[in-house]
Swiss-Prot record:
Species annotation: Shewanella oneidensis (strain ATCC 700550 / JCM 31522 / CIP 106686 / LMG 19005 / NCIMB 14063 / MR-1)
Task of the protein: Protein-arginine rhamnosyltransferase that catalyzes the transfer of a single rhamnose to elongation factor P (EF-P) on 'Lys-32', a modification required for EF-P-dependent rescue of polyproline stalled ribosomes.
GO MF, any single term: protein-arginine rhamnosyltransferase activity
Domain comment (free text): Adopts a GT-B fold and acts as an inverting enzyme that converts the beta-configuration in the dTDP-beta-L-rhamnose donor to the alpha configuration in the N-linked (Rha) arginine product.
Xref: InterPro entries: EarP
Protein name as catalogued: Protein-arginine rhamnosyltransferase
Entry keyword set: Glycosyltransferase, Transferase
């Protein structure tokens, strides 16, 4: 494959840290920049095996390939594909650029400073107040080049949120016809799910909260509509090993585990469009990393955010900041219980999780209505790609 470049292209470098979160965000951004702004994008990724789980047609053995108009290069050490400076250089989530790239930038700065790309560090999404003041700030590097911090966020003063131009219209059209979700479940090999059943998707880290919820759902399912929990192989299922008939690694996509009237369904991996549609089709979504966290919000369905645990419980500060924003227009009693449910889930508090789930009834109409209204409030008139393009033009 040709790796020729021109001065107008953008490079995005991404290291895969949490299997799918980081690459999920950068892959969506790369596709949107190509599709909506016709910007040539080269995406450098260090772990193509993980990437292939959300892009099944990707060949992890190739050093360079193209999908959706995006050139995908395998980020090797040293680089197997030469880096050719373009207009913009994006470090996703503070990844460390390859030495040969930094050396090339330093040389360019000395010999042809006008050819140095605009260098951006795409940061993690946060709802904390300090993000407004830090977005767009420059940091002088040893080479003498400025690197700018680009912070996604929920306010007009931040870098915005990744959201494709037609996403909400596609979601609304999908959700208007119940047949769509049933056809999706069938295509994923998920059997015996009826339109009136309660369906929950689970994409969390390991946690004691999941066995607690499964215990609750088993008991409730005897008196209510059947409950289906949809889980991919991986970290969520590890928490339920004691309920499974075999080791997690031995489970197959489409397999069912019946626990009374609660049924666990093993999900196959799917591409990003399939994942979006899955979230659109479930009554409640339990999500984790940045990509699934944001897509659960765009799904306009109630959700629980299992935030990535950090030292000194800093993740709980980030969780509180988001909950404060999300609950701003929510009735105080529902906001209080939804907040407590999220905190209890992220801390593995089994008794509290069951109590707050029962108190909240997450598929209740007020919370569902709020979930439908939230995406319009959160987008704040402009998405991340739009703001990013504007930022580059102004810089």
């Amino acid at each position: 494959m040709s790796t020729s470049s021109n001065a107008s292209h953008w490079d995005i470098f991404c290291t895969v840290v949490d299997n799918y979160g980081d690459i999920g965000v950068t892959w969506r951004l790369a596709k949107q920049l190509v599709n909506e702004y016709h910007i040539p994008i080269i995406l450098w990724v260090d772990d193509l095996n993980s990437f292939s789980h959300i892009l099944p047609t990707l060949n992890p053995k190739l050093v360079s390939q193209c999908f959706n108009g995006v050139i995908i290069n395998h980020w090797t050490t040293p680089l197997a594909v030469p880096y050719l400076p373009g207009k913009v250089l994006i470090e996703a989530f503070a990844c460390e650029l390859p030495d040969e790239v930094k050396l090339q930038l330093a040389t360019l700065h000395k010999t042809a400073p006008q050819a140095v790309p605009l260098w951006l560090n795409l940061e993690y999404l946060s709802a904390e107040d300090w993000v407004d003041g830090c977005h767009g700030l420059p940091s002088m590097q040893v080479s003498g080049i400025k690197k700018y911090f680009y912070f996604p966020g929920f306010t007009p003063k931040t870098g915005g949120l990744i959201c494709e131009r037609e996403l909400f219209a596609e979601r609304d059209a999908w959700q208007q016809d119940p047949a769509n979700k049933l056809q999706l479940f069938e295509s994923l090999g998920l059997k015996d799910i009826q339109a009136q059943d309660s369906v929950f998707s689970i994409f969390s880290y390991e946690t004691d909260s999941l066995p607690a919820l499964c215990e609750l759902w088993q008991a409730r399912a005897k008196n209510d509509a059947k409950i289906h929990a949809l889980l991919p192989k991986g970290r969520s299922l590890n928490s339920l090993q004691h309920l499974l008939p075999c080791p997690v690694d031995a489970l197959m996509p489409g397999q069912q585990i019946k626990l009374g009237d609660l049924t666990l369904h093993i999900l196959p991996m799917t591409d990003q469009q399939g994942f979006d549609r899955l979230l659109w089709s479930c009554d409640v979504n339990i999500v984790r990393g940045e990509d699934s966290f944001l897509r659960a919000q765009w799904a306009a369905k109630p959700f629980i955010w299992h935030i990535y645990p950090q030292e000194d419980d800093y993740h709980l500060i980030k969780l509180e900041a988001f909950i404060r924003l999300y609950c701003d227009n929510l009735a105080p009693d529902i906001a209080d219980t939804w907040s407590k449910l999220n905190f209890a889930f992220s801390q593995g508090q089994q008794s509290a999780v069951k109590t707050h789930w029962q108190n909240l009834n997450p598929v209740s109409l007020p919370l569902l209505q709020h979930a439908k209204e939230w995406p319009i409030d959160a987008i704040n008139a402009a998405d991340l790609a739009t703001r990013l393009v504007q930022f580059v033009k102004k810089s």
